């Protein structure tokens, strides 16, 4: 509750600041500099500029921004072309860097005549990596909405299946997933026959509707965890400290219709991992901005929206302001009263 109150407060403050710019400044205010979508990009930025992928399952969502000058930025993650100078170490698929083998590589993103690079190190690729229960399975259940209060996270559960609210009791969830319903809930011998997968995929009637898409991050995490025997992590496994949501607050003008989000998880052993694919997103105003399951914000209208990212029990926010040019607008030049 306190976190959501803080988000609402920041949302109100940002609106006041924007209104102040409208009232107190002239048409030269930089927030309202006109964007010409045809203007060639002046510079390109890729985030994170340097990162490490640990293990054969590691990935990193990239964020590429075009800065056309005049305070005009837009997301170009899905528009640029990518190249890895060492495909035996890392490859790029749909804007995601995926580990292929140990070593280092440079990723180059290009848009027209400009480019930006990121340095990647891949470690422990040959080391088997089990799906962690606490940081991936619980996150997958939360992202899919299975453990929300209106679903199986309610005190009495749904359809005889009960999970802790948003994964706040991992031990209860582990017992439930391993042993309930005569092991039909999760079938380690035939993972694809598990009700935990078939129901949210709508292969079997499910009152909660479709919650998973075959092949998405949540589905793969749950399936692989079941196939591996539904293990939990050993003692001393690094825990999550905090998350960071990118980009930082920004203003998007005409021509900027979407914004890729990236969520970085900071763990107790000092490692930083991409957790975007298993993060749940929300928006303060769906008439201004909507969010896809892949973490892409799409413009719905004009105004400001606060974007909330929730991974396990950690949250982070950013603000996106969508501006639209109004050619018919004329400053009324009110008379001075002081």
Enumerate the language-model features and the residues they cover.
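N-terminal secretory signal peptides that target proteins for export/translocation
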Residues: 1-13
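A composition/secondary-structure signal for short, hydrophobic, low-basic-content segments
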Residues: 2, 30-33
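Bacterial N-terminal signal peptides
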Residues: 16-30
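Aromatic- and Gly/Pro-enriched helix-to-coil junctions and flexible linker segments
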Residues: 32-338
């Amino acid at each position: 509750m306190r976190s959501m109150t803080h988000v609402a407060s920041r949302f109100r403050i940002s609106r006041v600041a924007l209104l102040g710019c409208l009232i107190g400044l002239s048409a030269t205010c930089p927030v309202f500099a006109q964007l010409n979508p045809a203007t060639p990009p002046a510079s390109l930025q890729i985030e994170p500029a340097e990162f490490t992928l640990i293990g054969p399952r590691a990935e990193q969502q990239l964020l590429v921004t075009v800065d056309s000058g005049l305070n005009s930025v837009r997301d170009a993650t899905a528009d640029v072309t990518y190249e890895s100078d060492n495909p035996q170490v890392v490859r790029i698929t749909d804007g995601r860097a995926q580990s292929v083998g140990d070593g280092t590589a440079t990723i180059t993103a290009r848009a027209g005549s400009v480019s930006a690079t990121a340095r990647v190190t891949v470690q422990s690729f040959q080391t088997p990596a089990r799906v962690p229960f606490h940081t991936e399975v619980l996150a997958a259940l939360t992202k899919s909405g299975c453990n929300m209060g209106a679903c199986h996270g309610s005190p009495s559960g749904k359809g005889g299946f009960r999970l802790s609210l948003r994964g706040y009791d991992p031990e209860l969830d582990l017992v439930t997933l391993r042993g309930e319903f005569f092991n039909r809930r999760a079938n380690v011998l035939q993972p694809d026959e598990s009700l935990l997968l078939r129901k949210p995929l709508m292969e079997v009637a499910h009152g909660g509707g479709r919650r998973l898409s075959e092949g998405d991050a949540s589905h793969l995490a749950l399936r692989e965890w079941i196939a591996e025997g539904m293990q939990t992590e050993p003692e001393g496994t690094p825990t999550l400290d905090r998350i960071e949501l990118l980009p930082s607050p920004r203003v998007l003008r005409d021509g900027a219709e979407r914004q890729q989000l990236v969520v970085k998880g900071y763990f107790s052993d000092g490692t930083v991992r991409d957790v975007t694919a298993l993060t749940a997103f929300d928006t303060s105003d769906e008439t201004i901005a909507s969010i896809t399951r892949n973490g892409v914000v799409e413009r719905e209208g004009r105004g400001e929206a606060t974007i909330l990212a929730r991974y396990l029990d950690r949250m982070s926010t950013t603000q996106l302001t969508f501006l639209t040019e109004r050619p018919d607008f004329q400053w009324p030049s009110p008379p001075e009263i002081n």
